[in-house]
Amino acid sequence: MGTKDRILIIDFSNYEDFPIGGYLTFARNMISSFGSDLALAGITTSRNDPVGRWFKKKINNVEFDFFAMARYDSTKTKKIIPDRLVNYLLIKYYRKRILDIGINNIFLQRQESLLALSDCKRNICYSFAGLDNPLVNSKYSYGGLMAHWFEDRFFKKIGVASLILGRGDEKAIQNMLLRSNGSMAGREVIKFPTRIDTTIFKPCDRDKARLKLNLPEGAFIVLTTGRLAWWKGWKFMIDSFMEFLKQSHNALFIMVGEGEDYDKIKLYISENKLADKILLTGKKGGEEIASYLNASDLYIMGSYKEGWPTALMEAVACGVPVCATDFSSVDEIIIEGVNGYIIRDRDEQQFAKGMLKAAQLQKPVKNDHVTRYSTDRLKEDILNHWQLI
């Protein structure tokens, strides 16, 4: 890839470990696939990085052109001002300096990023991380009030993108197109599943994984991974696990991840006297997450909404049986009775029954339908759709 064909990613992350979630995961997959052919604009959590100018930064021993729009404290998960608003204002403020690098191809995956760059006249690839309106279930009380206005404004500007990708199933894509009220008429949204690193997320010996993590050999381990936020359904999963415990007394529920609801979850565990039955591990890296997955007997996900969930893909890639609620793309990942079960109603007793059924499935479960979406093919798949200039 020549100099003129480089790609600039602008995203509200440090491209290493903050903030956790699907945006960061996909950005890191892009880094893994494209390497230093990328230039990165985002935020930094390092005191050593300059802010407001381009500099050279090493990530995973690869040197990148990097532009830090702001410095963040990664230990603070509760913020007064929404990240989306901060991201929009930062891109607007630093826009000229960011674009001065002279790269024509820009990859975006956040709505507010596109709004801030809607008149930049560059070759934009916009990738929907999820197909729902992100403000409908905002943790900020005023977010819902602005949801329709925000999405309407976004739909009117998305026409500037040369290519539009959607990390969701066909139903979610069609629902999104209907919500655009004709603003996206005639535009193709290409279904583009999230990617996983199959060199890390693959079936491995359960006992060795437990020994490595110092986990009890005889316990039935239930696992969930990802951001600890209300829309991930942590309360529903804990309540369902309490029902599951009535039938599986030796069960242990491990929640891997961090997020704004960590303290709430810890308190809820204490109130229900589950401290010896539920383990909060905090943030873990990819290889350690893979070890937890391989050490587990069952993976659960209780989300209210998802795009194309990387965490669920990683679990299936490791051959772990799963039980999940109903959300976009779940039918493309879970094959009922083969690698897991989908519980359509948010009923804790029904979900616990689904967990019991999934627990009977033999490991490793079928996973070839998700391992085909490996990061090894990400670069080729994107460039098959996106003509760089």
For the regions a language model picked out, list residue spans one by one.
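Aromatic "clamp/platform" in nucleotide-sugar-dependent glycosyltransferases that forms part
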Residues: 304
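Nucleotide-activated donor-binding/catalytic signature segment of Leloir-type glycosyltransferases, i.e.
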Residues: 266-284
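Conserved donor-binding/catalytic core segment of Leloir-type glycosyltransferases
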Residues: 216-232, 238-241
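Short hydrophobic beta-strand element within catalytic cores of glycosyltransferases
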Residues: 321-324
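Active-site proximal beta-strand in glycosyltransferases
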Residues: 105-107, 117-138, 144, 162-163
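N-terminal strand-loop element at the rim of the active site
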Residues: 11-18, 33-81
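Membrane-proximal helix-turn-helix segments that form the acceptor-binding/catalytic region
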Residues: 96, 144-165, 182
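Conserved acidic donor-binding segment of nucleotide-sugar-dependent glycosyltransferases
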Residues: 336-337, 341-348, 356-361
